[in-house]
From Swiss-Prot:
GO terms for biological process: dimethylallyl diphosphate biosynthetic process; isopentenyl diphosphate biosynthetic process, methylerythritol 4-phosphate pathway; terpenoid biosynthetic process. Pfam families: LYTB (PF02401). This is 4-hydroxy-3-methylbut-2-enyl diphosphate reductase. Its cofactor is [4Fe-4S] cluster. Isopentenyl diphosphate binds at H48, H84, H134, S233, S234, N235, S278. The gene is ispH.
Length: 346
C-alpha cells in the first residue's frame, strides 16, 4: 500500500528570479558566443549564480577576474563585463590592451553611476550606501576619484561619520539592498545632515523592491520560506532577511534542491518560495519537483505585481537571433508555460 504524502501549500512568489538586467547580461554572453564563437571571456561572474556560470562555461565562456588573465593568443576574442558594473579603470585598461569588450552592466546600475557623478559635478562629496567588497560597490566607487566617495554600511556608520563640508553632501545606494534597512540609514543621515542631496531617482532597483514586496506579502503563516540564490548574491540574502522579519517561522537560502535538509524541516504545511534576481527559473522548478516527491503539493501563486521591463543588448550583437532554446539552460520551458503547468500541478 502506497503511503499517503502529507499535504503542502507552496506560496510561489511573483515576481521572482531573473530581473531584466540579469536576463540582458546572460543574453549578451550567449549572443556573443553565437556571433564570435568560443571562447568569450567574462570579467567576474556575469551574475552571482554558479548554475548560470557553469552553464555558460559549458557553452564556451571563460571567466576571469582580471583582464591580464586573457592569453595573448585570444586578445581578438570579446570580453564581457559583468552585470554588477566595473570601475572606469577597467574599460580604460581594455582599450589600452586593444581588447574588444561588451559592457553588460545593468542599466539601473549605470544610472547610479551617473547619479554619483552628477553629485560630484555639483561639488558634493558622495555617500554610497552599500556593502563593502560587493562588485557593484567597487564599480560605483570606481567612477569617481579616490577620496570622493564614502561608503556607509549601517545605521551606526551613518551616526558616527564626519565630513569636512557637511552642507555639500549627496547620497546614492547599491541597487540590491533591503528597502527597510536602507530607509533607516537614510533617515539617520538626513537627521544629521539636513542639506543632504538625494539622487534624482530611487537607487534601489524595481526588481529588488518587487521581490522583497512579494516575499513580505507571502511570508506570514509560512512554516518555511526558501529563497533560491547564491551565498554571494546580495539581493538573495536580503530576501531571506525580509521573510524572517515578515513572519516566516524559518527561512533559508538554497542554491539547488539537493541543499534542502529534509530531516531538519520538521512538520510543515505552508512553504514560501522565491528566487533572487540572479537565480534561474529552472532551479525553482527543480525545488518544486523535490517537494512533490515528499508532499502532496498545492501551488498558490503569490503575485504582487507583473514585471514588463526589458533592456536592449549591445548594438554590436543585436543582429543575432536569440531563441528560446538558447536560454533553455536557465529558463527551462518558456516561463508563461511553466507557470501554467505549475498551477495545474504539472
Amino acid at each position: 500500500m502506497t503511503q499517503q504524502r502529507p499535504p503542502l501549500e507552496i506560496r510561489l512568489c511573483g515576481p521572482r528570479g531573473f530581473c531584466a538586467g540579469v536576463d540582458r547580461a546572460i543574453q549578451i554572453v550567449v549572443l556573443a558566443l553565437k556571433k564570435y564563437g568560443a571562447p568569450v571571456y567574462v570579467r567576474h561572474e556575469i551574475v552571482h549564480n554558479r548554475y548560470v556560470v557553469e552553464g555558460l562555461q559549458a557553452r564556451g565562456a571563460i571567466f576571469v577576474e582580471e583582464l591580464d588573465e586573457i592569453p595573448a593568443a585570444h586578445r581578438n576574442q570579446p570580453v564581457v563585463f559583468s552585470a554588477h558594473g566595473v570601475p572606469k579603470s577597467v574599460p580604460a585598461d581594455a582599450e589600452a590592451k586593444n581588447l574588444f569588450y561588451l559592457d553588460a552592466t545593468c542599466p539601473l546600475v549605470s544610472k547610479v553611476h551617473k547619479q554619483a557623478m552628477r553629485h560630484q559635478r555639483l561639488g558634493r562629496h558622495v555617500i554610497l550606501i552599500g556593502h563593502s567588497g560587493h562588485p557593484e560597490v567597487i564599480g560605483t566607487m570606481g567612477q569617481l576619484p579616490d577620496g570622493a566617495v564614502t561608503l556607509i554600511e549601517t545605521v551606526e556608520d551613518a551616526h558616527t561619520c564626519h565630513f569636512d563640508d557637511e552642507d555639500n553632501l549627496g547620497f546614492v545606494t547599491q541597487t540590491t539592498l533591503s528597502v527597510d534597512d536602507t530607509a533607516g540609514i537614510i533617515k539617520e543621515l538626513q537627521a544629521r545632515f539636513p542639506n543632504l542631496a538625494a539622487p534624482a531617482a530611487e537607487s534601489i532597483c524595481y526588481a529588488t523592491t518587487n521581490r522583497q514586496d512579494a516575499v513580505r506579502a507571502a511570508a506570514p503563516g509560512c512554516d518555511l520560506f526558501l529563497i533560491v540564490g547564491a551565498p554571494n548574491s546580495s539581493n538573495s540574502k536580503r530576501l531571506v532577511e525580509v521573510a524572517e522579519k515578515a513572519g516566516a517561522r524559518m527561512s533559508m537560502l538554497v542554491q539547488r534542491a539537493e541543499d534542502i535538509e529534509w530531516e531538519q524541516i520538521g512538520d510543515i504545511s505552508v512553504v514560501g518560495l522565491s528566487a533572487g534576481a540572479s537565480a534561474p527559473e529552472i532551479i525553482v522548478d527543480e525545488i518544486i519537483d523535490a517537494f512533490k516527491a515528499h508532499f502532496d503539493v498545492k501551488i498558490e501563486l503569490a503575485e504582487t505585481t507583473v514585471e514588463t521591463e526589458n533592456f536592449l543588448v549591445n548594438r554590436e550583437i543585436r543582429d543575432v537571433e536569440l531563441t528560446v532554446k538558447d536560454m533553455a539552460f536557465v529558463n527551462g520551458e518558456h516561463r508563461v508555460v511553466g507557470i501554467s503547468k505549475l498551477m495545474q500541478g504539472k
